[in-house]
């Protein structure tokens, strides 16, 4: 039986992530739960971005907008004494769907630089709106008064929150894979390659891309909701352009057009970031070149690098068998 690195490594990573709470409890280091909880949450957001960026070719420089919206839904509702998780989830999905539909209808009529700038403009508009909400902390942010509660299950428990986020991540990877392999995904990928030809074949590509954009926004909103419960705090910085840039880096670093890629990318990026922070306060000077080198070494990302290693391993195996 031949070893498939592109399957084995992601599965091993998921298995490792599933065991993090057990290890954190065993060594009495809750910090690991917080660190990897952040990795899982950002992996969800990166997976959502990969749907439109990796498969649809839509470079959104404002995707963190939906991360911030999901977080602010939790923060504002809990501020008013509402801790019902089902209400938090429903409002998050509704708000992100409406904002995603509105911004998508306007931005998807353009391509290239124009699309990038429009998505960035919308994100910055909501960023400054959040800064102006003095009742909810303004630029200083807002502490989350109460964690989301689903019946008797409260996300105030770090282990419960971690496993909920991990389950959402696994669901997103599985559902995303099914979605892009279906007719819907074929149209999205075809539109990325040649939108005019797809329209000539009778496919309403704008409608398909809008649906993908809205789905992506809603999933990212769920990540924001989980992030607010993780940090017990919401801030306009969650939807800043720098946060959107980080999501793009995670997707590109992990590998475009592969739902396991963003999981690898978010894990690698946040672990490297955390490691460098412990070495020097000027960690960004080292971090930037490291990311650039990583992308240059493997233009298809870490997931693509696994494929390259698989090919080399197969060639070496055949060479050894030929000599034998």
Language-model regions, residue ranges each:
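Transmembrane alpha-helices and adjacent helix-loop boundaries
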Residues: 1-324
């Amino acid at each position: 039986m031949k070893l498939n690195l592109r399957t084995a490594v992601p599965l091993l990573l998921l298995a490792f992530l599933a065991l993090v709470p057990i290890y954190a409890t065993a060594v009495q280091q809750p910090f690991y739960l917080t660190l990897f909880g952040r990795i899982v949450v950002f992996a969800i957001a990166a997976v959502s971005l990969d749907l439109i960026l990796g498969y649809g070719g839509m470079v959104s420089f404002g995707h963190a907008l939906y991360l911030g919206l999901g977080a602010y839904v939790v923060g504002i509702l809990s501020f008013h004494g509402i801790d019902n998780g089902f209400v938090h989830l429903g409002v998050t999905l509704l708000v992100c769907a409406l904002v995603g539909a509105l911004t998508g209808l306007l931005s998807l009529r353009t391509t290239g630089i124009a699309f990038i700038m429009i998505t960035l403009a919308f994100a910055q508009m909501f960023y400054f709106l959040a800064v102006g909400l003095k009742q909810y902390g303004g630029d200083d942010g807002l502490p989350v008064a109460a964690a989301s509660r689903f019946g008797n299950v409260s996300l105030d428990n770090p282990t419960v929150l971690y496993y909920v986020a991990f389950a959402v991540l696994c669901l997103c990877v599985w559902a995303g894979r099914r979605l892009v392999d279906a007719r819907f995904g074929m149209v999205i990928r075809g539109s990325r390659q040649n939108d005019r030809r797809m329209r000539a074949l009778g496919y309403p590509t704008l409608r398909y891309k809008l649906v993908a954009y809205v789905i992506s926004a809603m999933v990212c909103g769920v990540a924001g909701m989980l992030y607010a419960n993780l940090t017990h705090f919401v801030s306009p910085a969650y939807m800043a352009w720098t946060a959107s840039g980080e999501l793009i880096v995670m997707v590109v670093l992990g590998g475009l057009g592969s739902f396991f890629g963003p999981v690898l990318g978010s894990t690698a990026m946040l672990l490297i970031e955390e490691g460098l922070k412990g070495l020097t306060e000027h960690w960004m000077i080292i971090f930037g070149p490291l990311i650039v080198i990583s992308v240059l070494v493997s233009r298809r990302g870490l997931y693509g690098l696994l494929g390259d290693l698989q090919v080399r391993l197969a060639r070496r195996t055949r060479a050894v068998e030929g000599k034998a």
